[in-house]
């Protein structure tokens, strides 16, 4: 008799298996699980995750993430008590799919009743609890860099008191200071943290760019001066951290939660001027990277993606839109552009990643553009099935009439390969 070494279940039962005897302390958690669980499972299947890995991924969502998602959003009811930085509508949950490596990622902002009620006005408690629990689950998650940037980029108790006294009422959006992301790969998880120093900037008078660069400098990493110099030069960052071009705004630092020697640092900006020339400048570091063949090859593919998406060029005035949940963006809404650069002591130039935000664009048009780009890349299977996949994630809507399903597309190019991720609306 053969004794199986793995417990398996029919694919269609993976969600039901965990749901059957699940218990949640609140209706909000139950609703988050019932909505996000099937959605995640569909993405995992489409990304060709082995069946044996699907249940652990869902279990992590159910047990660790769902308890930190806060109030479940409902159309027509009161606005969410906490406006998250994760998505356009302030929802603290976003799924994305790295199409080259077939990696599914969940971006989220851990919340608790303390943040939603205003007791924890800058939401410091829930992210700390959640990331500590993540680190207990997987010994590859290292919090050394997380602790470093927490110390330098989060408001202190004294700064909190001052902000609440002197700057009240604080804006609805932008109060969050840290978000997390988990990726499911090779039967395990990897994690990333993102720091938004907007509140620290408001409290100290120092710009977000200066706060981020100073915190990186305090790591005292040998070899990091040159890539930081090239980044400063490209963005025209002055000593105070402000770019000479006021349309460009540093706003975010990303860091891998792994051993410090492997942890990447990512410096993020928004750009209110959306044009191909701006994209090319960011990609090439104003021409400095053109000596690298990888740069030119990636730029050529990025140009094809840009042309296929046909993003309208121009100046974007609305950096933080205030859309009511359940209401589509206005037809004339166009978001800013985003970019990040990976800073490594092992590389002379920082590696760029460009985010072409597509909220407000017709979803059918975006899907047609993506399918055409998949064909350019030789991803013929994905090209032939992509529209059906998206329809399974969002059953019901007529994509010729929606403009919010595809939040954006990110593109980078490393090791002679295009890295393309698609970001989806959580609802």
From Swiss-Prot:
Residue numbers binding dimethylallyl diphosphate: 105, 192, 194, 268, 353, 355, 419, 423
Top-level taxonomic group: Eukaryota
Major enzyme class: transferase
One GO molecular-function entry: prenyltransferase activity
GO biological process entries: verruculogen biosynthetic process
Binding site for substrate: 94
A Pfam family that the UniProt record links to this protein: Trp_DMAT
EC number: 2.5.1.110
Record's function text: 12-alpha,13-alpha-dihydroxyfumitremorgin C prenyltransferase; part of the gene cluster that mediates the biosynthesis of fumitremorgins, indole alkaloids that carry not only intriguing chemical structures, but also interesting biological and pharmacological activities. The biosynthesis of fumitremorgin-type alkaloids begins by condensation of the two amino acids L-tryptophan and L-proline to brevianamide F, catalyzed by the non-ribosomal peptide synthetase ftmA.
Family per similarity comment: Belongs to the tryptophan dimethylallyltransferase family.
Protein's UniProt name: 12-alpha,13-alpha-dihydroxyfumitremorgin C prenyltransferase
Organism, as annotated: Aspergillus fumigatus (Neosartorya fumigata)
């Amino acid at each position: 008799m053969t004794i199986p070494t793995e417990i398996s279940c029919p694919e269609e039962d993976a969600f039901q298996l965990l749901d059957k005897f699940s218990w949640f302390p609140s209706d909000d958690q139950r609703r988050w699980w019932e909505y996000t669980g099937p959605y995640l499972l569909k993405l995992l299947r489409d990304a060709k995750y082995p069946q044996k890995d699907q249940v652990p991924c869902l279990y992590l969502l159910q047990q660790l993430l769902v308890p930190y998602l806060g109030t479940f959003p409902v159309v027509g009811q009161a606005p969410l008590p906490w406006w998250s930085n994760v998505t356009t509508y302030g929802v603290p949950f976003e799924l994305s799919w790295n199409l080259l490596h077939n990696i599914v990622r969940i971006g989220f902002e851990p919340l608790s009743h303390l943040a939603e009620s205003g007791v924890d006005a800058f939401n410091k408690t829930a992210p700390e609890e959640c990331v500590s629990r993540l680190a207990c689950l997987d010994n590859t998650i290292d919090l050394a860099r997380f602790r470093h940037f927490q110390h330098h980029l989060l408001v202190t108790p004294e700064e909190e008191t001052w902000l609440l006294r002197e700057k009240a009422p604080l804006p609805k959006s932008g109060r969050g200071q840290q978000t997390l992301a988990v990726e499911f790969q090779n039967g395990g998880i990897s994690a990333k943290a993102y720091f938004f120093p907007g509140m620290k900037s408001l409290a100290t008078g120092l710009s977000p760019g200066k706060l981020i660069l100073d915190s990186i400098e305090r790591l005292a990493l040998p070899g990091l001066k040159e890539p930081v110099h090239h980044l400063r030069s490209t963005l025209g960052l002055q000593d105070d951290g402000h770019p000479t071009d006021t349309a460009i705004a540093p706003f975010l630092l990303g860091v891998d939660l792994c051993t410090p020697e492997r942890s990447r640092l990512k410096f993020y900006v928004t750009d209110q001027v959306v044009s191909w020339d701006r994209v090319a400048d960011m990609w090439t570091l104003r021409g400095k990277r053109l000596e690298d063949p990888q740069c030119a090859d990636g730029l050529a593919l990025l140009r094809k993606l840009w042309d296929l998406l046909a993003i309208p060029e121009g100046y974007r005035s609305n950096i933080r839109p205030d859309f009511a949940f359940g209401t589509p963006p206005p037809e004339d809404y166009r978001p800013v552009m985003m970019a990040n650069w990976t800073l490594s002591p092992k590389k002379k130039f920082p590696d760029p990643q460009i985010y072409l935000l597509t909220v407000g664009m017709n979803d059918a048009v975006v899907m047609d553009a993506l399918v055409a780009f998949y064909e350019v890349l030789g991803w013929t299977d994905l090209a032939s099935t992509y529209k059906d996949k998206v329809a399974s994630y969002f059953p019901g809507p007529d994509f010729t009439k929606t403009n919010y399903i595809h939040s954006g597309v990110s593109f980078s190019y490393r090791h002679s390969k295009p890295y393309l991720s698609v970001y989806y609306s959580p609802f």
